[in-house]
A protein has these predicted regions:
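Arg/Lys-rich, glycine/proline-spaced intrinsically disordered segments
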Residues: 28-29, 205-215, 272, 282-283, ...
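Polybasic low-complexity intrinsically disordered regions
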Residues: 30-31, 36, 44-53, 57, ...
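Non-catalytic DNA-binding core/recognition domains of DNA-processing enzymes
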Residues: 37, 59-61, 76
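DNA-recognition alpha helix
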Residues: 53-69
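Basic, short loop/linker segments at the boundary and entry of helix-turn-helix/winged-helix-like folds
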Residues: 2-47
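Helix-centered, glycine/charged polyanion-binding patches within enzymatic domains
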Residues: 181-248
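Major-groove recognition helix of helix-turn-helix-like DNA-binding domains
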Residues: 67-87
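Basic, amphipathic alpha-helical segments enriched in Lys/Arg and hydrophobic/aromatic residues
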Residues: 222-295
Length: 295
């Protein structure tokens, strides 16, 4: 369970973030709960890995959380479900981080759409000739410096990695884009060079020719920059370990929004961790050693 001091910082950061969304979607709203309160609860739900009923019970027995969310009374779990269904993924995307970085890393990973493990699901569908492969495929672009998630694209079932490469990068700005061999294609490199005005650091497959500019010069590959790509795998590992590798929602639209809420919760969490590191570093005394100085 999240500790009380960290809960305070998490809720405060969440309340500041959700102000990007209008407080009410309509002037005819009943004004009992505003959008900022409901968004904060849904983000907190992902941080605590709770169901709708569980997060409501948590708020009922946690006066600190209610006070920080300015809740005069706790909403019903159906209120959160209806609000979640009304939200659009585009509105949630605006809650992700800034769109500019030095190095951006792109990768994809799968999330289960039920509680069954991969092995158990295959046993359950053992009569089928093909393996059980129904899952959500999440493609993300991260800032390798802060490890914030900057953009995302979610699809149902297996898809090739290169399909979503331009989509997650189209609104971003950077100096370098790093990705693994799964994104090796002339089309992707041309997109990064011409559309983003950046340099692609994508290793070539054995069957791929070297990309050449119009003048005949080869596109250089910098291994030192490419090694930053491992950080996107770290981000996926943290998300699945802290928030779960399965999705509770039933419909595809709800599953997408639940996963975006999970990314938002991760970004808030990451921001708090980085701020604590900076505070700890700045609070250390600045000692100067005169051992090797001669006067």
């Amino acid at each position: 369970m999240i500790k009380e001091p960290f809960l305070k910082r998490f809720v405060l950061s969440t309340k500041k973030l959700v102000t990007k969304i209008p407080r009410y979607f309509s002037k005819f709203s009943n004004k009992i709960y505003d959008n900022h309160q409901k968004l904060s609860i849904l983000i907190l739900r992902q941080r605590l890995k709770m169901t709708y009923r569980e997060i409501i019970n948590f708020l009922k027995f946690n006066p600190l959380a209610r006070a920080m969310l300015n809740l005069k009374k706790v909403p019903e779990f159906t209120t959160l479900i209806k609000f979640h269904n009304r939200l659009k993924p585009e509105e949630l995307n605006s809650l992700l981080c800034d769109k500019q970085a030095n190095i951006i890393a792109v990768d994809a990973s799968g999330f289960q759409t039920n509680h069954m493990s991969y092995h158990y699901a295959n046993q359950w569908h053992s009569q089928d000739k093909r393996k059980y492969r129904r899952y959500l495929k999440l493609t993300i672009a991260i800032d390798t410096n802060t490890q914030y998630v900057m953009a995302q694209k979610i699809r149902l079932s297996p898809r090739h990695d290169t399909i979503d490469f331009p989509f997650v990068l189209r609104d971003l700005k950077c100096d370098y884009v790093v990705a693994d061999r799964g994104y090796d294609s002339k089309k992707n490199r041309r997109f990064v060079l011409r559309q983003m005005k950046s340099f692609p650091e994508i290793p070539y497959r054995s069957i791929s020719p070297t990309y050449r500019f119009s003048g005949g010069n080869k596109l250089e590959f910098h291994k030192q920059i490419y090694h930053q790509r491992s950080k996107v795998e770290t981000v996926f590992s943290v998300i699945k370990r802290k928030y779960g590798n399965y999705i509770l929602s039933q419909t595809f639209e709800s599953q997408k929004k639940e996963l975006i809420f999970r990314l938002i919760a991760y970004n808030v969490d990451r921001k708090l961790i980085l701020s604590l590191v900076l505070i700890r570093v700045s609070s250390e005394p600045f000692n100067i050693s005169f051992k090797y100085l001669n006067f």
